[in-house]
Every structure is written in structure tokens, then in C-alpha cells.
Amino acid sequence: MSAQISLNPMATTNAYGLFQTNSAGFTQGDALDDPSVKFFLAGGVLATDAATPIWGGIPIEELIAPTVYPPPAGSGPGSNLGSTVTQAASNAVITGFSVFNQAYGGITTPQSTAPLYSPGMSVNYYRLGSGARIPLLIDPALVSLDGSIITSQVSWDFAANKIIAYDAGVGALKVRILKISTSNNLTVNYDGMTGNANWVSGGVLAVCLI
């Protein structure tokens, strides 16, 4: 028996019944705040021939800025609007990832609650090598990577728009996985039949350094 008070200052929690807010979890495509990389945020225009709209957390292919919009011919401020971007169709052409950060022009409706950016609209993104940390959708089976080295190889499923186990036929995605979050996340569910995209609570996200 001891007269000393036992205290573990690291075992903290919220008291019950205080209407507390839990700040755990991430939002797909919403890059984490970082003063050292915020000025690397880039903007461009989604290609007019893009097959689908785009949203945050999607690998993009950046093309050299055209002299006029819409490319390849037309009139307008041209390269002042930034590069032309489109959804990357293969691992070899991924140049960055789209994000929701400061992208206030996304279209939402009562039936489509996640912001979507149509061909010709402005899209914000971070390039590979920028050092941005972006939450990306990941296959729940890859929770098994917890505790592994951050350079563990993974691939991207271009149909399901998520990180999957490494596939030599697809190639390694050029990201480092810093953290995998399994709860309190917001992910985007895009329905190709209706063209709607909605927020889904509870998906699995990986915070990726690009």
C-alpha cells in the first residue's frame, strides 16, 4: 500500500454526457494542413474529353498547359488557367492527385452531396513529389499493412478508384502510406449509372505521402 496517488497523464478521455466532438478520422481527398507544402497546391482545367467528372483523391495525368481553351482549339486566357488534367488511366501516367482543398467550385445537389468537377471546370491537385499528405481510399483488406514499413508497395485500382494490394501487372503506386484510418472517415461513392457522388461515413482511408 502506498500513500502516493497513481496517475497516468497519457490515459485521457472525454467524460460521458458532454456532447463531445470526436476529431479522429479523415476526409478523402482533403490534404492535411502543412505550411511547408501548401504553396505547392496547383490548379488546372479538367479536359473536355474526360469520361467522368472528377473529385478529391483521384490520380490525375497533367498535360502541358495549352495556349487556348478548350484544347486543341478555341479562345480564352489559355495557360493562365493552368494545365489540362484528366483522370489517369494507368500507373505510368500518374503525375499527382486531385484534392478538395480550396476547390470551392465543385457541384453538389440534394442527390449528389460530394463536390464533383465536370469537364472544363477548375480542378486543384498536388503533384507527385510535393510532399502533400492526402487521405486516399484503400481496400479494407490492406489494414493488414499496419506496422509495416511506409514504403510497402501497393497498386491503384483504376476501376474502383482505390489502393489495392501490389499487382506487378499494374505497377507500384508512387506513394508512402503513413497511416491507415478505419473509422470516422468520409469517403466518396460515385455511381456511374446516375452520375451522382455521395459522402459515405465509415470507409477505410490511407494517409499517403506523395
PLM regions: where:
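Surface-exposed, low-hydrophobicity beta-strand/loop segments enriched in small/polar/acidic residues
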Residues: M1-I210
